[in-house]
Swiss-Prot record:
Residues 1-42, 88-127, 139-168, 180-261, 461-531 are annotated as: Disordered. It comes from Candida tropicalis. One of its GO terms (molecular function) is phosphopantothenoylcysteine decarboxylase activity. This is Protein SIS2. May stimulate expression of certain genes that are periodically expressed during late G1. Also modulates the expression of the ENA1 ATPase. Its main location: nucleus. Residues 155-168 have a biased composition (Polar residues). The lineage of its organism: Eukaryota, Fungi, Dikarya, Ascomycota, Saccharomycotina.
Length: 531
């Protein structure tokens, strides 16, 4: 008997009307060829094959897909998984995996759709699918003013209808701050109303005298105290700001906010640039001497500090310069804090326009190289780079002897002397450097000589008022002496005239005397004749 292997099924002809299963799954209705069978198609009878011969191991037959409209079912975009999750009885009690500490921190978007979290969580961007969209809880919006103050920061929380409860929890602090602000404004308005009503009570009292005045003052004090208690720290900050504003308006020295500097104030304007060297302490002596010579009514001094010079300048010295000597001190950061928009003044341009003379003392090798090459990477070098050549610049080098005597330094000094005639380099001194005991050139010029050179550049030493008064008194004395001499001469002339008159009288008397003598002689002759 032949085995199953020997039995071969006859080759079945390929049906032309058979459609692939992939196409059947795509189309919504069966093709017309299935609904309208063609009569020309001949069906060949197939021989009966034993069932055992068709059961070929390893081949699984897939069930036939139904294409009828009645059996079709609408499935959501989430698929069967979402449907099972929605139909499961414990889906309402299901907790997101993000809230369970034992599980992974990641949570699928389906969990967000079914059970959105009560606490706000950060999403980089919402899902592109409509049914996966989770509306984020927005934080309170603040309006920030240009000055950075919090006066206009009225909280306007934005909440979504789905997450109203979490947003209310998040905005609890904002609501408290709003309530405190409202209480403060109400107390201030009530205090203002009471202050306005008290003068009316005093006027209506008529001749109440001192009692009515005392009552009004007491009510004012109580309302002011309540207003201060309600305001709290806000009142403290406002009072400090007002005090700072009043102090800045009194004197010339103020905080480095507005770089617009007065130019036509009738004073000499001296700008001092300070670099990082041990001779920084001499700047205080130079400032004191200049103020002693000219007084603060005739001279105004401002200082520019480089980044390295701040390491050598003591806080006590800086405090004395700013608060006692009323010297405004600028740093590199002020270049950007004073300039915010295009129309704001530029600090290094304002300093260049303000200054009558610039002194760089002490001058390091680093800043010397920047000046010679035109590098401007800080506030001081920006001022020098934009300097008006009609005004002088004095440089007082202070460096090591080997640095000063190097060929690079000589070349830079020669370049400045040839191409920048408005810059004068003061010759350094020979001194002992550091603890090594080296003696060489490179020490900064004596500060008295620097002061003398500044005074000469500004037009010379001013005359003292005492000397002027002494000179005026001497002139007055000399004039009075000259006037007295003139009076004496006039008196002498009068005396001479009197003498001349006396002489004339004598001459007249002499002329009248001879006739009398003749008459007497005639009388004597007559007497003799009578005898």
């Amino acid at each position: 008997m032949p085995s199953d292997k020997d039995i071969k099924s006859p080759a079945q002809p390929k049906k032309e009307e058979e459609i692939p299963k992939s196409i059947l799954t795509r189309i919504s209705s069966p093709p017309p060829i299935l609904n309208q069978p063609d009569a020309n198609i001949i069906h060949h009878p197939q021989p009966q094959v034993p069932q055992s011969s068709l059961n070929i191991p390893g081949i699984k037959l897939s069930p036939q897909i139904s294409t009828s409209l009645e059996n079709r079912e609408i499935v959501m975009a989430g698929g069967a998984y979402l449907k099972e999750r929605m139909e499961s009885p414990d889906s309402l009690n299901h907790k997101p995996t993000l809230l369970q500490p034992d599980k992974s921190e990641s949570i699928p978007s389906i969990d967000y759709t079914l059970n959105p979290p009560k606490e706000s969580q950060h999403h980089k961007s919402p899902s592109v699918h409509a049914h996966f969209y989770v509306e984020e809880t927005l934080r309170p919006v603040r309006n920030r003013s240009r000055s950075g103050s919090n006066s206009n920061n009225n909280l306007t929380p934005i909440t979504s209808p789905q997450h109203s409860e979490p947003s209310s929890i998040l905005n609890k602090d904002a609501i408290k701050s709003q309530e405190s602000l409202r209480a403060t404004t109400n107390s201030i308005s009530s205090a203002a109303a009471s202050n306005q009503s008290t003068p009316r009570s005093i006027i209506s009292g008529g001749g109440g005298g001192g009692g009515g005045a005392n009552t009004a003052t007491s009510s004012n004090s109580t309302t002011s105290n309540t207003a201060l208690a309600a305001q709290g720290t806000t009142t403290t900050t406002t009072t400090t700001n007002s005090n700072s504003n009043t102090t800045t308006t009194k004197g010339e020295q103020n905080s480095n906010i507005d770089p617009r500097l007065p130019q036509d104030d009738g004073k000499f304007h001296v700008l001092i640039g300070v670099c990082g060297a041990l001779s920084v302490g001499k700047v205080k002596l130079i400032v004191n001497k200049l103020l002693e010579i000219y007084t603060s009514d005739k001279i105004s001094i401002q200082v520019i500090l480089t980044k390295s010079s701040e390491n050598f300048l003591l806080p006590e010295t800086l405090n004395v310069l700013e608060n006692v000597k009323k010297v405004r001190v600028w740093t590199d950061i002020d270049e950007w804090t004073t300039w915010k928009t295009r129309l704001d003044p530029v600090l290094h341009i304002e300093l260049r326009r303000w200054a009558d003379i610039l002194l760089v003392c002490p001058l390091t090798a680093n800043t010397l190289a920047k000046i010679s090459l035109g590098i401007c990477d800080n506030l001081l070098t920006n001022v020098i780079r934009a300097w008006n050549s009609s005004y002088p610049i004095l440089l007082a080098p202070a460096m090591d002897s080997h640095s000063y005597s190097s060929s690079t330094t000589k070349r830079q000094l020669r370049l400045i002397a040839d191409d920048m005639p408005w810059i004068e380099v003061l010759k350094p001194l020979e001194k002992v450097f550091g603890s090594y005991g080296d003696i060489g050139m490179g020490g900064m010029t004596d500060w008295n000589e620097i002061v003398n050179r500044i005074v000469m550049k500004l037009g010379g030493y001013p005359e003292d008022e005492d000397e002027d008064e002494a000179d005026d008194s001497k002139d007055n004395i000399d004039e009075s002496a000259i006037i007295d001499d003139d009076d004496d001469d006039d008196d002498d002339d009068d005396d001479d005239d009197d003498d001349d008159d006396d002489d004339d009288d004598d001459d007249d008397d002499d002329e009248e005397d001879p006739p009398q003598q003749q008459s007497t002689t005639d009388n004597s002759k007559d007497e003799t004749t009578n005898l």
